[in-house]
Design a protein with these regions (language model features):
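S-adenosyl-L-methionine-dependent methyltransferase catalytic module, highlighting the catalytic core
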Residues: 118-122, 126, 132, 136-243
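A structural signal for well-ordered alpha-helical scaffolds and beta->alpha junctions
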Residues: 45-49, 63, 204
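Short low-complexity stretches enriched in small and charged residues
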Residues: 30-42, 58-66, 95-96, 196-200
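A short catalytic or substrate-binding loop motif that flags glycine-/basic-rich loops and adjacent residues
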Residues: 57-58, 69, 232-235
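Short charge-dense sequence patches
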Residues: 50-59, 76-81, 149-165
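Membrane-proximal basic amphipathic "stem/tether" segments
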Residues: 1-58
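Conserved SAM-binding loop
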Residues: 61-149, 205, 240-244
Length: 244
């Protein structure tokens, strides 16, 4: 174990002890839980870094999915920071592929979960770097433009949208009005540590700007393909396909 890994292990022990103390207040506990989660992600990532000689996957996969969670796609190498991915990797640190080495990068409902601008812009540049010329980046996110366009929504419509997105979440009982729904699209911050917050909201125009800035030649709307994308994401999401 390296000195850094020893430090991280000691830190985790300290965080657990502080969290277990009755003196720890609600605000401090929230921050400590977030820190524990980051430490655990960091450990997954460090273990994968140690397994990769030269820091890149060899041979390079033809297609990769980023942040697929439980939605694995056949024929793709599935990269996520938590299981059941093929590679546990923190994409905020880059994409571990060689330059110009892959044909397709797919993600949906992932981009809004990494901080903007640093990590979102880094991701766009990394996707551009690893794609071969002509390669394609497909990206789907919750469509903030759609959600905002419905405001102010009548209570029945608000209830329908809330049910579609949050029926299975523990937070469901706290999402009561349309403005609560808008808050969630922009800042999804469940106290449940298994959820990643939303850090930034996107629409078609923002995706075009982000990927053009990263060097992609064209960014067009992508026609939803349920053989690849998660069918539950079809509603109220916006997808684009960017070509290098
Ligand atoms: C809301 S889920 C979406 C899962 C799937 N794409 C879908 O549409 O059902 C977001 C996913 O992004 C992953 N994720 C978040 N931050 C990440 C990071 N820094 N590196 C890799 N994956 C990350 C999470 O672990 C999670 O699986």
């Amino acid at each position: 174990m390296t000195p850094h890994d020893e430090q991280i292990t000691a830190l985790l022990t300290q965080l657990d002890q502080a969290l277990g103390s009755p003196a720890t207040t609600h605000g401090l506990a929230r921050t400590l839980r977030a820190a524990v989660k980051e430490v655990e992600l960091h450990r997954h990532h460090r273990a994968s870094v140690a397994d990769l000689s030269d820091g890149v996957l060899k041979p390079s996969p033809t297609k990769i999915q980023i942040g697929g969670g439980g939605h694995r796609i056949e024929g793709f190498l599935n990269i996520d920071i938590v299981p059941p991915a093929d590679l546990l990797w923190d994409v905020r640190e880059g994409i571990p592929l060689a330059d110009d080495s892959t044909q397709e990068v797919f993600s949906e409902h992932f981009l809004e979960h990494i901080d903007y601008p640093r990590s979102a812009k880094h991701y766009a540049h990394e996707a551009h770097r690893v794609l071969a010329p002509g390669g394609q980046l497909i990206t789907g996110v919750p469509d903030a433009a759609y959600v905002l366009s419905q405001y102010p929504a009548p209570p029945e419509q608000a209830t329908e949208m809330i049910e579609r997105w949050y029926a299975k979440r523990e937070c469901r009982s706290d999402i009561n009005t349309y403005l609560d729904l808008i808050n969630y699209v922009f800042r999804d911050q469940d106290d449940d540590p298994t959820y990643n917050p939303h850090y930034w909201a996107y629409d078609h125009g923002k995706l075009v700007q982000l990927f053009c800035e990263a060097g992609f030649k064209t960014v067009e709307p992508w026609t939803f393909d349920p053989t690849m994308a998660n069918p539950k994401r079809r509603w109220a999401s916006v997808y684009v396909i960017a070509t290098k």
